[in-house]
Each structure stands twice: as structure tokens, then as C-alpha cells.
Amino acid sequence: LRAVGRNISLLDQLEIALDWAANGEADLVGYRVYRSVNASFTPTSDLLIAEVETPRYIDRAIEVGTSYYYQVTAFDRGNKESAGSVGANGLALPLPELVEPITGQLASAQTVFSWRPVSGALSYRVIVTTSPTSGEISDMELTADTTAVFNGRTVSGSSQEALESSEIYYWKVIASTRDGGVENSVSAIENFKVR
């Protein structure tokens, strides 16, 4: 069972997505999804939030900053229910607040990006694009800091290229509670122009 919380302002998306391995039993009817705010819980009818036929569920009845814990069971035609799965938890973080550069601001080719810390975030990733919706050109590392410097982008092989003067670029920050920077929340998008 895997749970990933997401708070993505651009998509007006606040949810925790649950995925698990399918049960191969011939008489399988579906799955029951249980949720609690306590890590060690026993699946009971008062904690049942959904019955689904496929091994995926999107929980949209969540609040930002609350950790939710989930277990899933399988049930068959005779209404026999399996034991609860290994638990998983998800958390939708508050949106990162971008500090600079902000819309309309001039920046150097080695732009320093900064944002306010997000409670619960373990890492951040800055995404720089050539349009509001596509054209990612950044390859900055994950950071636990609330600043990052754009030193250049890789264009071919290992050669680095700076941001181009007089061009407008867009940026956002992804905050994560998981290893590898899986997105839990994505900031609004700001733009800036390179001097």
C-alpha cells in the first residue's frame, strides 16, 4: 500500500492517492479502504471511507497538514474480508510560498531562488521552465534548504548553459515528505526576467 498526499495549486488539487497490488482471488468483489488519524488502528466500520473495485483510491476529504493513516482489505462474494494491509500514511503539505524572484522582478543568470519553509517538508525541488506549463530547463538537486541557486542547465552531455539575458522564465517549488522528492505540494508559479 502506498499513499501520496498532494496539494497542487495550479490544478486546485488537494488529495491523497492510494495504490496497492491487486488481489488475484477468483471471487474477489472489491476492496475496503479504512482511514484514521492514529498510526496504529484496527479497521472498523466507523473508519471505512470507501469500497472500490480497482486497487486505487483518491481521498479528497482531507485537510492540509493532517497526517492520515490507511489500511486496505479485500472482500469476496461471501463478504469475507481479509486482514488489513500493512498501513500507509499520507500528508498534504501547505503550499510553498515563493519569496524571490517574484513576478516582474529582474534576476541574474545565476538566479537565487528563495521560499518560506513548509512545516513537515523534508526536501524541496525548484523547477524552472520556459512557459507557465512546460519547457522544464532546470536540473537542480533536491535540497532541505529554502534557497537554491541556478548555476546553469545541462544542454548536451555535461556542458552547462546559463539562463539567457532578456528572457522571461517561470518557476515553482515542490515540497516533499518522502525520499526522492515525491511531490506533496506544489507552489503557485511566478515569473522573472533575466537581466
Model-derived features: positions:
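An aromatic-rich alpha-helical recognition segment common to small helix-rich domains
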Residues: 20, 33, 59, 68-72, ...
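Extracellular low-complexity, O-glycosylation-prone stalks/linkers
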Residues: 25-47, 121-140
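Short S/T/G- and acidic-enriched coil/turn segments that sit immediately N-terminal to beta-strands
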Residues: 53-58, 111, 145-159
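Solvent-exposed serine/threonine-rich low-complexity stretches and specific carbohydrate-binding patches
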Residues: 45-55, 137-148
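Beta-strand-rich modules
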Residues: 57-81, 160-182
